[in-house]
Regions:
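Residue(s) in the substrate-gating loop at a strand-loop-helix junction
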Residues: 134
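Conserved NAD(P)H cofactor-binding loop of Rossmann-fold oxidoreductase domains
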Residues: 84-89
Length: 268
């Protein structure tokens, strides 16, 4: 049985991957992983491919035992893995709880590595892995410090794994969008959008970012993908300008009048 697996599939970018992936890969079933069962079940009404909801919290280590057992029992051929589960918290380091710090690292880094490692033995040549990353991967970003650091890890891990798996015919690509209109913001703000992070100069649509990511995954040899000319310019800039200067840009932007470009104060 040929399958695709998408984590973080209940909303946002993960859900959009489920909606669009059939344009690039033909599978018998899509395994969708997230915590909210109802949101996963509702995907059955939106795609023609059979959906298998798997309700798991990927911050919990026992979840990977469940995934390993399912893979061992069914022995599917995984054509595509999309690791889209993740979250971030905005604000000065001392305002982010230690529990949120731990969960960011567990979900953004540990879960991504565990899912990748568990799936590779069930992948044949021609299979693909997409690791959802962020523009913040390319430089340190004060006031989203831990989130940005986890995304730097994802970029490095993805590019290295793409090289390691080349001889197996398995392609790995990081996808590095700018800010995207998703539920991410519902949880990222500390309180009602107040605090050190208030200003966003641009938000992209999830469907457009996902379309670019899938196209780059299947139609190019890139090991990371960015969507939108302004984002591409920023990535080029941080390669040329010393990071000690780049790190001042984000805090200086936050001194501008609050402008969440379409977000309400609770991030929606």
């Amino acid at each position: 049985m040929n399958i695709a697996i998408v984590t973080g599939a209940s909303s946002g970018m993960g859900r959009e991957f489920v909606l669009q992936l059939s344009g690039y890969v033909q599978v018998d079933e899509i395994w969708v992983i997230a915590r909210r069962e109802a949101a996963l079940e509702s995907l059955r009404e939106e795609v023609s491919v059979p959906i298998r909801p798997i309700v798991l919290d990927l911050c919990e280590s026992a979840s990977f035992d469940t995934v390993a057992s399912l893979l061992e029992a069914e022995k599917p051929n995984i054509k595509l893995l999309v690791n889209a589960a993740g979250f971030g918290k905005f604000g000065a380091y001392h305002k982010v709880s230690l529990e949120d710090e731990r969960r960011m690292i567990d979900l953004n880094c540990t879960a991504l590595v565990m899912m990748t490692r568990l799936c590779i033995p069930h992948m044949a040549p021609g299979s693909h892995i997409l690791e959802l990353d962020s523009l913040s991967a390319f430089q340190p970003v004060p006031y989203i410090t831990t989130y940005a650091a986890t995304k730097s890890f994802v970029l490095s891990y993805s590019r290295s794994m793409n090289r390691e798996l080349k001889n197996k015919g398995i392609r790995v690509m990081a996808m590095n969008p700018g800010w995207v209109k998703t539920e991410f913001f519902n949880h990222a703000f500390q309180t009602n959008g107040d605090g050190e992070v208030q200003y966003f100069n641009r938000l992209y649509e999830a469907k457009d970012c996902v379309a670019t990511g899938l196209k780059d995954l299947y139609k190019t040899k890139k090991d990371y993908s960015v969507h939108g000319l302004p984002v591409k310019i920023q990535v080029a800039m941080v390669k040329l300008v010393p990071h000690r200067f780049v790190m001042n840009i984000w805090p200086n932007q936050q001194k501008k009048p609050k402008n969440n470009v379409g977000l309400t104060t609770d991030g929606k």
